[in-house]
Amino acid sequence: MRLSAGPDAGPSGNSSPWWPLATGAGNTSREAEALGEGNGPPRDVRNEELAKLEIAVLAVTFAVAVLGNSSVLLALHRTPRKTSRMHLFIRHLSLADLAVAFFQVLPQMCWDITYRFRGPDWLCRVVKHLQVFGMFASAYMLVVMTADRYIAVCHPLKTLQQPARRSRLMIAAAWVLSFVLSTPQYFVFSMIEVNNVTKARDCWATFIQPWGSRAYVTWMTGGIFVAPVVILGTCYGFICYNIWCNVRGKTASRQSKGAEQAGVAFQKGFLLAPCVSSVKSISRAKIRTVKMTFVIVTAYIVCWAPFFIIQMWSVWDPMSVWTESENPTITITALLGSLNSCCNPWIYMFFSGHLLQDCVQSFPCCQNMKEKFNKEDTDSMSRRQTFYSNNRSPTNSTGMWKDSPKSSKSIKFIPVST
């Protein structure tokens, strides 16, 4: 992308425009020559092998993200069970991942295919806005989901006070805040001339002040990654502490009650069977959702941390020069971040067994295969039952008993408890 330090400043950027945040500071002389600013002839060049790899990975990422998140939404729609708050958050997080797939991955793949952005200035600004909007929405949906788990675990009484209304307000706030915080893209990016000789135009970033790129990348990194990670870490710190205190208290209470009950039971001559507590069951369900949310947050951090680290390094380290050979590092970190939208659906299905079953049953071909397998299992079970009943029938067993050398008195019928 291009950085402009003033009216006469030349373009600067990586050898290819990429992704929502990249400002591309630090052009080399070879890149300036390619843009028509050096002594050599102007040429539009890029690493074609890297571009083909990026296009292939983006295509696979888009297909897997759309298939996985659409399956989750379809399964949630068809599930006969009562929709819980967690299902509501999963639905909107899947919608946010679909926004990343359609508004970030798909436009970037088309852009890489054409090399230069093909469209008017307003479309350039809209595409850049929607690319960052998906990233904000995915991050903030994780924040509100974790906040809901924090309230459920640490303040369970508040979950009885209109929980559905509070959850919907949190989700609506996440969507609105994501849309508002991504609007600076309209003022940063535009269609500008990137080649002084060929007059080639592209959708690049423009900054009036030299420190504009640092402020922009720092703001986006803080809003999309640092602030959400700090909030997520704080919430999970309180959640883990509360669960630890809860488990320790239950263990001590169970041991004291067990000792008292064992003494009374020993005196009366019988043993009391332990009863199952409903509080314990609810706690296990909450812990399972907390584990699922923790895995989703971990996947988000692992996928996006390299991208934001590279971006911050490129604008804050004065000694960093992103040469053409180092561009694969930027591309690979960006592709790793886009894979996050593919991971979440499988995490949902792993922690929700019925969700995977409902997802499989949503496809007609899978339903036909399931009915076929069920029919085969039923026929096989019927044949086994028929064979067993024939061998145990009175007509066959009478003849065998008569021919037996042993006396019938030796046969003892032992009652079987049912």
UniProtKB/Swiss-Prot annotation:
Differences in regional receptor expression in the brain as well as differences in social behavior may result from a highly variable repetitive sequence in the 5' flanking region of AVPR1A. One such allelic variant has been linked to autism. One of its GO terms (cellular component) is endosome. It is a multi-pass membrane protein. Residues 1-43, 377-410 are annotated as: Disordered. Belongs to the G-protein coupled receptor 1 family. Vasopressin/oxytocin receptor subfamily. A lipid is attached at C365, C366 (S-palmitoyl cysteine). GO terms for biological process: blood circulation; calcium-mediated signaling; cellular response to hormone stimulus; cellular response to water deprivation; G protein-coupled receptor signaling pathway; generation of precursor metabolites and energy; grooming behavior; maternal aggressive behavior. Signal peptide: none annotated. The modification Phosphoserine is found at S404. Its main location: membrane. GO terms for molecular function: peptide hormone binding; protein kinase C binding; V1A vasopressin receptor binding; vasopressin receptor activity. Residues 1-52, 111-125, 191-218, 314-331 are extracellular. Pfam families: 7tm_1, V1R_C. The keyword Disulfide bond applies. This is Vasopressin V1a receptor. Disulfide bonds join C124-C203. Residues 383-399 have a biased composition (Polar residues). Residues 77-88, 148-168, 240-293, 352-418 are cytoplasmic. Keywords: Cell membrane, Disulfide bond, G-protein coupled receptor, Glycoprotein, Lipoprotein, Membrane, Palmitate, Phosphoprotein, Receptor, Transducer, Transmembrane, Transmembrane helix. It comes from the Eukaryota. SMART domains: DUF1856. Glycans are attached at N27, N196. The chain crosses the membrane at residues 53-76, 89-110, 126-147, 169-190, 219-239, 294-313, 332-351. Receptor for arginine vasopressin. The activity of this receptor is mediated by G proteins which activate a phosphatidyl-inositol-calcium second messenger system. Has been involved in social behaviors, including affiliation and attachment. It comes from Homo sapiens (Human).
